[in-house]
A protein has these predicted regions:
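Membrane-embedded alpha-helical bundles of multi-pass transporters/translocases
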Residues: 1-240
């Protein structure tokens, strides 16, 4: 359950979305795009990191465990922060170019893009979960992530159901995103008792601004290009 909390939260979101016409399709199409970086980066890192951490912790290699965790976080953020910025800044062109054809009408593009942008805000959190969870699993602690997952699902359900009457179908996406950050925050807070092996090293702290700042500049450039190329992006021949 702890490892699949993202998928469970998405399922809850779809149940909430089922009360709104077309919302299930919009949620599904947006999910296709945001699951790509999550699957390629987050899940892959988690699979590689768990046995490495387990081996290092078993051998008492605290420094090596810290290095492995910090490099995993560094690599994850290096790839997912720019991806998240792109999903937030240019969701409309992405959806229009990839999906706008056949039964997917121009009127479907905007709500799908809205959901995609909201999911994009939570993408770093979803990926960081895959990096932080191995810290617990490597110590054979499955109860703590399970407890955090339950808390996260409560947050998701409360927000999705509570906000739906106020903001409509997008409440499902907001619930998923906020619950993702809630899960990540709990996992990070729980590592305080794990000692030096679970702390970010100086290299990660130095490189984090170098990841965020270029991603922000990229976002500004994408926004400007989208505005300049608005007519071209709307033409039929650029759709895949």
């Amino acid at each position: 359950l702890a490892g699949g909390v993202v998928q469970i939260n998405l399922l809850v979101g779809r149940q909430v979305g089922s009360f709104f016409d077309g919302a299930i399709a919009w949620l599904n199409y947006a999910d296709r795009l945001y699951q790509l970086p999550l699957g390629v980066v987050g899940i892959a890192i988690g699979i590689v990191l768990l046995p490495d951490l387990s081996r290092r912790l078993k051998n008492g290699d605290t420094g090596g465990s810290r290095h492995a965790l910090s490099r995993a976080m560094e690599f994850a953020l290096f790839l997912t922060v720019p991806a998240a910025v792109a999903l937030v800044v240019i969701p409309v062109p992405l959806i229009a170019v990839l999906f706008e054809r056949g039964q997917f009408l121009p009127s479907d593009t905007l709500p799908t893009a809205q959901v995609l942008a909201i999911y994009g805000l939570g993408l770093p959190a979803f990926v960081l979960q895959k990096v932080l969870q191995p810290l617990y699993f490597a110590r054979e602690d499955t109860r703590t992530p399970f407890r955090f997952a339950v808390h996260s699902m409560v947050v998701n359900a409360a927000l999705a159901i509570g906000l739906a009457p106020l903001i409509g179908f997008s409440a499902a996406a907001w619930g998923t995103t906020f619950s993702g950050w809630a899960m990540t925050a709990q996992l990070w807070w729980g590592t305080r008792t794990m000692g030096e092996a679970a702390r970010a090293d100086d290299r990660l702290r130095r490189r984090l601004p170098r990841t965020v700042l270029p991603a922000a500049i990229m976002g500004l450039c994408l926004w400007a290009l989208t505005w300049l190329m608005a007519d071209m992006l709307g033409r039929e021949h650029v759709r895949i």
